[in-house]
């Protein structure tokens, strides 16, 4: 069950249709070794599409867990997204990003909702 519309609006939540997520993942991801970030993963529409794309390219579950990171503020939505295999961090994106620029992680691809990402 998705959160009520008013809650989504307050937190900036928008759920991308599966076909759009698949199209963007296919367009953006070029190799099975890309380090990929989804900065506002919600319930995992893009995370699922990213994992599917990487599996089709021959990536293992272990490499997907290592190479794909989703960030989601909402604990319930982060839990839903984590079922698709990649690493999902329950955090504010800006807090997570600060750790990245401090040298913890770099990414080749950023995937997410158009026109927001």
Indicate residue ranges for each PLM-predicted region.
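SAM-dependent methyltransferase catalytic region
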Residues: 1-117
